[in-house]
């Protein structure tokens, strides 16, 4: 992914986030910026609204959050980004990836906790 972004840096204008699970390292998440620089961490944030929520994420992210707490955290993050950034989307699409399954959830703007 890094090489694809780097080799197409003149025609791509997006950062990428790639996440998944495998039996060797477990959960992993990577961010690849617009020139192909890759970072790995506990979470990744990208897009025009990310500048508005990075501080909130740094202050409130807890690696030991329950699934319910993590979903509320994400809902607040995305709501804050949309509230401050007119270019951030009008809905949320959450995906929970585990060893056993992939669960998808769609949340319309009307259900955002912060508007």
For every predicted segment, state its role:
Residues 1-115:
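Long, low-complexity N-terminal extensions
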